[in-house]
Amino acid sequence: MTENNDIKMVIITGMSGAGKTVALQSFEDLGYFCVDNLPPMLLPKFIELMADSKGKMNKVALGIDLRGREFFEYLWGALDDLSERTWIIPHILFLDAKDSTLVTRYKETRRSHPLAPTGLPLKGIEAERGLLTDMKARANIVLDTSDLKPKELREKIVHLFSTETEQAFRVNVMSFGFKYGIPIDADLVFDVRFLPNPYYIPHMKPLTGLDEEVSSYVLKFNETHKFLEKLTDLITFMLPHYKREGKSQLVIAIGCTGGQHRSVTLTEYLGKHLKPEYSVHVSHRDVEKRKGH
């Protein structure tokens, strides 16, 4: 097995209704390989898979439900086994909340508590709390989510488990051609087909917006300058608000007919404009699809 001190594993457990789903989504946003409801008896096998992954699973978050006493025997054994391995140090994140808060959440979602499927949720909560006493005592971090909104819980997890780089709000700016379809992962789409098209100038037809002659042509028009002024003003206004709402990244797509000239030029411009303030990735989805045709 490989020795790798960079492997991180977080076991997420705690009271049902305390926010495990939000927690797993938060770890997923941080680039963790996430598995929900992993039976504790499978944990040793999963650890072996991590060891053999050659770095492909160097950050893992596992959501584990402990709804039967027999599960604890498997979990304690697996955790004791982990303590003997130098290449991985597990962290246990225990999510808790007040009984009254958990009851309210179950009423709002109209779901039954897993330990009281036909009874009152409070009975199930009390039973689960008793089962999880030792688990809570062994946890590295206990988070009380009673007064936390989902966005606030996510912010806490990001603060606790991410590096400064991982906390950075990422902006992806891409060009595309409408004839090939709008990118399905785009958050914001801008249509620049109203701008003069270099495609109809014969010697520019095989070029792209990455070529200086094309970009200079597109950027020389007054309407281009006015549009870029309004676009950068709008994006600069919106980005801090998206970040405040808890988004980890935003995809901005700029499209022209074929994704060769106008959209490429403006995508490059916007990317350079945003880079001093944000972590920006610029890409051109369709730039090779009909180049030279």
Curated annotation (Swiss-Prot):
InterPro entries: P-loop_NTPase, RapZ-like, RapZ-like_N, RapZ_C
Domain of life: Bacteria
Positions annotated to bind GTP: D65, L66, R67, G68
Keyword Cell membrane included in the entry's annotation: no
UniProt keyword list: ATP-binding, GTP-binding, Nucleotide-binding
GTP-binding keyword on record: yes
Positions annotated to bind ATP: G14, M15, S16, G17, A18, G19, K20, T21
GO molecular function, one term: GTP binding
Similarity comment: family membership: Belongs to the RapZ-like family.
Function statement: Displays ATPase and GTPase activities.
PANTHER family (UniProt xref): RNASE ADAPTER PROTEIN RAPZ
Protein name according to UniProt: Nucleotide-binding protein BcerKBAB4_4948
